[in-house]
Amino acid sequence: MDGLETALPSLTDNASLAYSEQCGQETPLENMLFACFYLLDFILAFVGNALALWLFIWDHKSGTPANVFLMHLAVADLSCVLVLPTRLVYHFSGNHWPFGEIPCRLTGFLFYLNMYASIYFLTCISADRFLAIVHPVKSLKLRRPLYAHLACAFLWIVVAVAMAPLLVSPQTVQTNHTVVCLQLYREKASHHALASLAVAFTFPFITTVTCYLLIIRSLRQGPRIEKHLKNKAVRMIAMVLAIFLICFVPYHIHRSVYVLHYRGGGTSCSAQRALALGNRITSCLTSLNGALDPVMYFFVAEKFRHALCNLLCSKRLTGPPPSFEGKTNESSLSARSEL
C-alpha cells in the first residue's frame, strides 16, 4: 500500500520534485474543474453515506453479515469523504497547501486508509454472497454477525498499520514559494510501490472477480433458485464490479505506470505532465466510490430502498417490507443474509 512506500525526501528528491512540479502543474481551468468535481462528490457522498449509515444502524436488528460489512463500508466512505474539502481548498488556492505538515499527513493517511478499507469490505461482501448462494447450508455457522465484526476489525487494524508510515514521515515540500502536500497526487514514486499495489489491490480484486464468476456459474446451474433472487444477485455483481472498474482499476493501473516512469531520467516534460494529469484524474475516480456505494445500496438492497422511501416519502409503502427470514425453499436458505 502507498504508506509502505513512503520515505524521507532528500535534497536530490526535492530538486527532482521542483522540476516535476513545473511540468505537472495544474492549469487554472483544471483547478476549477477538479474543485467543482470534488464539491459535487462531497455533497453526494456525504449525504448518501450519512443516510446509509443511519439506516444500517437503525436496522441493526437484521443482524446479518452483509449488513455488518455494508455498515463498515459506509463508515469508510464517510471518513474518506471528510478529507475531500482539503482537496477543494488546494485547487481553489492554486495548487498551494495552506494547512501545514500534520494535516497533510492525516489527509494522506485517511484517504488511503479508507480507500483500501472500502476495497476490502467490498471483497468481504463478495465472499459473503459467494458463501450464501453457492454454499448456503455449509456456511450457516461461519456466516455470523460476530465473525463479520471480527473480520472488519482485523481489516481496519491491518490497513491502518500499513498506512502508518504516512503519519511519521515528512509529506510537505516547498517549491517556488508554494507548499506542496505530497499526498495530493504527488506520492513518492518508488519501485517498492509495485509490490504494495499487488498486495493492496490485485488480491482483493481477483478474489472479488472469482467469487462472482462462481456465483454466476451456480446461478446458471441452479434452476430451483427463485428468479428475483437471481436478479438481485446479478444486480449485486454488476454494481460491485462497476465500482471496481470505475473507481479502483484505473487508479491502480495508472499508478503502476506512474511509479515506473514519473520523475525518471528519460521522461520528457510533456510525458510527466500527462502522467501527472492522469494521476489527478484517477484519484478523482477513487473518491467517486463514496458517491457510488449509496447507489449500490439503493438498487441492490431492498430493505435499504424500502427504508429510504419511507423516510423520504414520510409514509409506509404498501405491502410488507422485505424479509430476511421469510424464505422456506431449499434455494433460499441464503435469504438470512440477503441485502
From Swiss-Prot:
Q: How is the protein disposed in the membrane? A: Multi-pass membrane protein
Q: Which residues are glycosylated?
A: 14, 176
Q: Which residues lie on this side of the membrane: Extracellular?
A: 1-36, 86-105, 169-195, 254-280
Official protein name in the record? Uracil nucleotide/cysteinyl leukotriene receptor
Origin organism is Rattus norvegicus
- GO process annotations (BP): G protein-coupled receptor signaling pathway; negative regulation of inflammatory response to antigenic stimulus; oligodendrocyte differentiation
Q: Where in the cell is it found?
A: Cell membrane
* Bilayer-spanning residue ranges: 37-57, 65-85, 106-126, 148-168, 196-216, 233-253, 281-301
What Gene Ontology cellular-component terms does the record carry?
Answer: plasma membrane
Induction annotation: In brain areas affected by ischemia.
Q: Name one Pfam family in it.
A: 7tm_1
Query: What family does this belong to?
Result: Belongs to the G-protein coupled receptor 1 family.
